[in-house]
Curated annotation (Swiss-Prot):
GO biological process: L-methionine biosynthetic process from homoserine via O-succinyl-L-homoserine and cystathionine
Lineage: Bacteria, Bacillati, Bacillota, Bacilli, Lactobacillales
Keywords tagged on the record: Acyltransferase, Amino-acid biosynthesis, Cytoplasm, Methionine biosynthesis, Transferase
Residue(s) at site: Important for substrate specificity: S191
A Pfam entry, by short name: HTS
Enzyme class, UniProt record, top EC level: transferase
Function: Transfers an acetyl group from acetyl-CoA to L-homoserine, forming acetyl-L-homoserine.
EC number: 2.3.1.31
Pathway(s) of this molecule: Amino-acid biosynthesis; L-methionine biosynthesis via de novo pathway; O-acetyl-L-homoserine from L-homoserine: step 1/1
Record-annotated active site: C142 (acyl-thioester intermediate), H234 (proton acceptor), E236
Residues engaged in binding substrate: K163, S191, R248
Protein's name in the database: Homoserine O-acetyltransferase
One cellular component (GO) term of this entry: cytoplasm
Record-linked InterPro entries: Class_I_gatase-like, HST_MetA, MetA_family
Length: 313
């Protein structure tokens, strides 16, 4: 099924060329079903790249979705034109009185900062608090996962001895609906300087550890009801994303390590193998289906009329 987005969004042309079905308001309004409303808090610097990556996976689900993008008004993007943000993004003030079936919080390149030093931290905390009563399920990605854990539970991140960069094998708890249809292990890209410790999750939260890797440590956590999902990897990444990050850091004189298990024979001039797209598609599909669609209240405009709303509060 399609995703419903602004037909002028740059990602539309890319997705259409990949035979991914997108529709505009006119066509969607003639379908007599309620689409799921998904909000994406895009904290990544290359907004349009991340938009396309996220939308590619959301469009793979068998349900109609209406997508809105959110940005932090307390932060000014230095890499995306203001016109793009004003046209395709909403501020928190514009959405705070609405209800959403799902929220995706992306990563952000601010790991080197304490959470409180991030210029939009106060606004981020407001979004997390608001999501507890206005969003049915939230999927946090990479820094977004670390920040969500800190905001909700006080679980802090820890500096790693070297950047974790590459494609790694992780376990999958196939007994959990998020990993239904997965093999015992799957591959996913990781790109981060910090980590969350297993003992902190065990001691400070009631979250379940659903995926763990020898190299990655914690990979995916979730609450028992799947209203909170935390993924420390980047399953949404394109084939060449880690490559672009590597050459960017190399050009900046950071002397980066070659991403592990990525380039054939560690030859940076080889085209990287893509070995995670099927797992990524299944993960996003499972999140939409099992964490959102099958549980979310039907009448978000008047949630007091839906008994399931009171069941999860």
């Amino acid at each position: 099924m399609p995703i419903k987005i602004d037909k002028k969004l740059p990602a539309v042309e890319i997705l259409s060329s990949e035979n991914i079905f997108v529709m505009d308001d006119d066509r969607a309004d003639h379908q007599d079903i309620r689409p799921l409303n998904i909000l994406v808090l895009n904290l990544m610097p290359q907004k349009m790249v991340t938009e396309t990556q996220i939308l590619r996976h959301l469009a793979n689900t068998p349900l109609q979705l209406t997508i809105d993008f959110l940005y932090m008004s307390s932060h000014q993007s230095k890499t995306t034109r203001a016109e793009h943000m004003e046209t395709f993004y909403k501020t928190f003030d514009e959405v705070k009185n609405r209800y959403f079936d799902g929220l995706i919080i992306t990563g952000a390149p601010v790991e080197h900062l304490p959470f409180e030093a991030v210029d939009y931290w106060e606004e981020f905390q407001q979004v997390i608090e608001w999501s507890k009563t206005h969003v049915f399920s939230t999927l946090h990605i990479c820094w977004g996962a670390q920040a969500g854990l800190y905001a909700r539970y006080g679980v802090d991140k820890h500096q790693m001895t070297r950047k974790l960069s590459g494609v790694y094998s992780q376990s999958a708890d196939s007994n959990n609906l998020l990993f239904r249809g997965f093999d015992d292990e799957f591959y996913a890209p990781h790109s981060r300087h910090t980590e969350v410790l297993k003992e902190d999750i065990v001691n400070l939260t009631n979250l379940e550890i659903l995926s763990y890797g020898e190299d990655t440590g914690l990979s995916v956590l979730a609450s028992r009801d799947l209203r909170e999902v935390y993924s420390f990897g980047h399953m949404e990444y394109d084939r060449d994303t880690l490559s672009k990050e590597y050459f960017r850091d190399l050009k900046a004189g950071k002397n980066p390590h070659i991403p592990e298990n990525y380039f054939k024979n560690d030859d940076v001039h080889e085209t990287p193998a893509l070995c995670w797209s099927s797992a990524a598609a299944l993960f996003f599909n499972n999140w939409i289906n099992y964490a959102v669609y099958q549980e979310t209240p039907f009448d978000w405009e008047n949630p007091e009329n839906d008994a399931s709303y009171f069941a999860y509060l």
